[in-house]
């Protein structure tokens, strides 16, 4: 197999030639024997529980099943490293090579790659300039296609023929005195026909011709020509050949990526890919045998079609025709199913890797937090900052080594919390909420240690994360290097991200829980029980009574207050009722105010009707404004 570079800039996916596929899996042993071709459908011998030679788990092709041990047991232990056993042909090496060593299957007949045939758009159909329906009829042995019309007047290149039409022309050709001259393979069927048509394409010449046609073409025809030219240009740019879309050699992925494990009852659980590969090998071997004994054409053709369907199911089960199902009528997972989708290799394992120094928990409101702070559970913090805590414990001489420090942390020694407090002081953490749709989906906060297991979040930053507190989860990441910490503090701190980068409008706005809390706090409940007129000399006295439980949050109270007063939305003040008192003092009473004035109209005292909730809200706002 070709050696891969240790350092590279990017991964490029392209078409592989049959020679390249064989190169991936082929190795030459010291005795000159070439191994790599999988020829048997067997997997593991049920008596010895060892992989069968030349089978899907062959140790000669893929490497030893046990570290430093050959198949026959002649060589064991690491001292025989690199030796190839002369008896069984297995190289003595680590078993992990079975995760990257590949094999291959030489197909007895070519088959089309289902991605290029049934993809949208179909690249094979685009390149051949044929309707997809016609290409499918040829591939699945329902129609012949003319690949060389010879001197026939009534035949054209790429014309489709039924079985009867093909036989009729064959009869005409061999009639006495017939002038019809056609080459031996003038019409073909199956993937061989598609391969022949693709081989005949001269990419450079075709591209030049298409460019000329595009200049004069209009409308739908022009769009079709441009689409075809784009595909041809891509083939030229990548140095790929069109006939490589038809497979003559099928790669077999490493056995440890399609494992077979023994269960408790002695039964085996296996990857679906092994069943799909087994179907391909069985049909391929049967086809090779039929060709060898020169079986009737109809039987050979049927076997070729079945081989095509088996390879289709292996690459992309269900893309065309009936889905191949296993036990319990469950569709088998093909190579495409393993790659694509949310649980596929790309999204699950490459884009969504597990990360060190990270945690995840449910978010709850942190009402006592500042905007740049988040509440980090102690249990999570000690795990995330463990290396920093261990370093500090050793530096202070509290413990002598890492093992003792870990033991101290596991035993929840009270000293570790003081050290942890010091470690997290000024060390920001990153909070991320999936899906991270814009820059503000991940922000930095200064952690504050809290009890419990939930991450506490300031409600003002919720709109940026599109978070609410109905069970949302967030991930915590610890920036380790000083550069990362500086970047988190300067660029990502929540207090530095007040405006939306998309619109420039403020994104730090009260929402959801804050709005609901403010509404509930200041709401006037008309159905609150009437507890009679309660009078308080000051706002503070009213709050003391509320704290002691003498009055409720929405109880109507009269409070002595000399500042301005605004009515809420929908609230109207009634006409004042005037009561004359001794000494010329007048008392004006409305449904919201009681004002006592002297003879000159100067206010002696004012009582307003409010609720403890509104007093709390007013006091909070006043305190912030005067701070």
Swiss-Prot record:
It holds the Pfam family RNA_pol_Rpb1_1. Zn(2+) binds at residues 70, 72, 85, 88. It is an enzyme of class 2 (transferase). GO terms for cellular component: DNA-directed RNA polymerase complex. Mg(2+) binds at residues 468, 470, 472. It catalyses: RNA(n) + a ribonucleoside 5'-triphosphate = RNA(n+1) + diphosphate. InterPro entries: DNA-dir_RpoC1_gamma, DNA-dir_RpoC_beta_prime, RNA_pol_asu, RNA_pol_N, RNA_pol_Rpb1_1, RNA_pol_Rpb1_3, RNA_pol_Rpb1_3_sf, RNA_pol_Rpb1_clamp_domain. Binds 1 Mg(2+) ion per subunit. GO terms for biological process: DNA-templated transcription. Its EC number is 2.7.7.6. GO terms for molecular function: DNA binding; DNA-directed RNA polymerase activity; magnesium ion binding; zinc ion binding. Keywords: DNA-directed RNA polymerase, Magnesium, Metal-binding, Nucleotidyltransferase, Transcription, Transferase, Zinc. It comes from the Bacteria. Its cofactor is Mg(2+); Zn(2+). In cyanobacteria the RNAP catalytic core is composed of 2 alpha, 1 beta, 1 beta', 1 gamma and 1 omega subunit. When a sigma factor is associated with the core the holoenzyme is formed, which can initiate transcription. HAMAP family: RNApol_bact_RpoC1. DNA-dependent RNA polymerase catalyzes the transcription of DNA into RNA using the four ribonucleoside triphosphates as substrates. This is DNA-directed RNA polymerase subunit gamma.
